Amino acid sequence: MIPSPVRWIRTWALVLTLLLVGLLAWPVGAWASLDNDRYDGNIYALYAGNGSLVPPRLTLADALADHRVTLLVYYLDDSAVSKRFAGVVSELQRVWGNSIELIPLVTDPLQGRVDAGPSDPLHYWRGVIPQVVVLGPEGQVVLDAPGQVEIDIIHAALSKATGLPLPPSSSERRMTSFNELNDGWQAVAPAASSRE
């Protein structure tokens, strides 16, 4: 018995439907990468394991009105340089906690705007990323540094602005990679002393 053309069409339609469903259900690996300028999502959640950094708790205007030492970090979510700096920003939050106001600011909304004065984040941004600005309790600029700023330089500026002692040197801690995406800081074991 020869199958009718309608049966062949139904059979092929079923096979193609199952094939299409199978392809759509196939798991696709993550495409996030530290080494490209592609948007992967919130860089602090993805690359530093710390999604609590954004959005910031206070605006710059509120932090200045409360006379809080403020750390502004300008970044872009789709910048490899900002992605690599995310672990440093997370470590600064861990060390300084509630002693300072940490305000990470994505720079896209700042572009093409007019500077509205010292309470406006645009006032301090120089058009580079990342950029770190430490403001003292009276709003004075203690540090304004572009690029991948050494964490010890930022610690020194925050210590000066807050009057709190410096945290342990980064030579006692080092940046490590937990996996292909997340970086973090971990204590370095002291070197064994040799006896002569």
Could you tell me what each predicted segment is?
Residues 28-59:
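N-terminal "domain-start" segment that seeds a small globular fold
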Residues 1-8:
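N-terminal secretory signal peptides that target proteins for export/translocation
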Residues 81-96:
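Typically the conserved alpha-helix immediately C-terminal to a functionally engaged Cys/Sec
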Residues 90, 101-141, 151, 159-162:
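Thioredoxin-like thiol-disulfide oxidoreductase module
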Residues 63-78:
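Short active-site neighborhood of thiol/selenol oxidoreductases, capturing the structured segment around
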